[in-house]
């Protein structure tokens, strides 16, 4: 089933992990352009080079950009660069974030750590939504041609990276769980506000994924691998490419009537716990 992803994507956090997998997947699926944004420009450049080697569109172009999502002006510069290079933004994937490095109960939680999580995971996502929305609102509506029929599929799609912790709580990771819950609230609110403008907003909510972020979490808690094997019904963590597959579907015309939802991709982990 072709996803018909021949537009332009902006992916933050694209220097590693899920963001990198998503950027590469867009290139392989036929996107004509991908803005590969990361705080680490060298990492973004490396992803860009890799994407060029697997791109399937004959006119594909990768645009590596340094961005600090906590800085509104930096985000605006990224979006301006995207428009100057490609004229529009069809898919915006907000993957930049920080994960768990230290496990502490709530009575030992540090305000400084909470602020750091909030700045990146929540305000960083908000900054990207605000800036990209200004572009999407003014661009033309895309059309899907299928089986001899055509239908309008909107002006653009925004996909935020949440977590299965957007729905559940895990002991000793208060800042992470709190901010990932907030990402889901932001996603739902933005979906309501932007639906009249024909812009969809959703979230993907992974469990543990084989990324540097999870490696850092394991370094902070050596018991984590055994716990993962015990509580994940599929008995393994996800690969970044498995998350990217869902991201591509959720931003494609094939999901054109889906907005305001979080798609949990966790190998069945949350099936065994009560969600909110």
UniProtKB/Swiss-Prot annotation:
Superkingdom, natural source: Eukaryota
InterPro entries reported for this sequence: NAD(P)-bd_dom_sf, Sc_DH/Rdtase_CS, SDR_fam
EC number: 1.1.1.-
GO biological process, alphabetically ordered: secondary metabolite biosynthetic process
Catalytic activity annotation: (2R,9S)-annullatin H + A = (2R)-annullatin F + AH2
Deletion consequences: Abolishes the production of (2R)-annullatin F and (2R)-annullatin G but not that of (2S,9S)-annullatin D and (2S,9S)-annullatin H.
Presence of keyword tRNA processing: no
Known role: Cytochrome P450 monooxygenase; part of the gene cluster that mediates the biosynthesis of annullatin D, an alkylated aromatic polyketide with a fused dihydrobenzofuran lactone ring system that exhibits potent agonistic activities toward the cannabinoid receptors. Within the pathway, anuF is involved in the formation of (2R)-annullatin F from the diastereomer of (2S,9S)-annullatin H (compound 12).
PANTHER family (UniProt xref): SHORT-CHAIN DEHYDROGENASES/REDUCTASES FAMILY MEMBER
Protein name listed in UniProt: Short-chain dehydrogenase anuF
Underlying gene: anuF
